[in-house]
A protein has these predicted regions:
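Active-site neighborhoods and metal-handling regions in enzymes and metal-associated proteins
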Residues: 1-191
Length: 191
């Protein structure tokens, strides 16, 4: 792990996690989770580990402030056919947010617990991973006998398909100054 080399590493962020209302998200977290499970079934997987923070916040309809100028939460998610395991700095999750997530079948765990939890996966597990987004330590902690299915994260693909409700969030008023700046920088007229 990086801590073995990076000895003066700053503490992990504990910025609050907040939920995103379905009117902005376009779809409930329950529906998104079911869509991911459907994609898992199609791929022949029964476990899906997500490491990409932007996909995690999209899937769970949450946001955070752990990385400057990026509304993500330092976290991992492990989706099974029964539960969703959310690995996060638990101090950053209020009781209200925890209750909302638990209602959707999401179980919270300490951020670092994922490394031990993947070691405990059953030998007959079929784990879907996106190799470009999975860290080496997490991958090396997988039991030897599990089947790994390297595939693009279905949440990333689903996230790219904007729903009608999401388009409404892009229809924000543009000020005269913003139009002028855009006109100057692009040479295009914005109406």
């Amino acid at each position: 792990m990086a801590g073995a080399i990076w000895t003066d590493r700053p503490e992990m962020s504990k910025e609050p996690v907040y939920t995103l209302d379905v009117k902005y998200a376009g779809k409930s977290r329950e529906d998104k989770i079911q869509d991911v499970r459907d994609a898992m079934k199609e791929a022949g997987a029964n476990v899906h580990i997500i490491s990409s923070m932007d996909d995690i916040v999209w899937l769970l309809n949450i946001r955070g402030n752990d990385i400057i100028y990026n509304p993500v939460v330092m976290s991992y998610v492990m989706v099974t056919m029964e539960q969703v395991h959310f690995y996060v700095q638990e101090e950053a999750v209020s009781e209200q947010v925890r209750a909302e997530l638990e209602k959707a079948g999401v179980v919270l765990h300490d951020y670092f617990a994922i490394y031990e939890d993947v070691k405990a996966l059953a030998d007959d597990s079929k784990i879907m991973l996106e190799d470009a987004c999975t860290n080496y330590t997490l991958y090396k902690n997988l039991p030897e006998n599990v089947e790994v299915i390297f595939q693009s994260n279905p949440a990333a693909i689903m996230k790219g398909c904007k729903m009608k409700q999401r388009w409404k969030t892009f229809e924000l008023p543009i000020s005269k100054m913003q139009r002028q700046c855009a006109d100057l920088s692009t040479g295009l007229k914005i109406m």
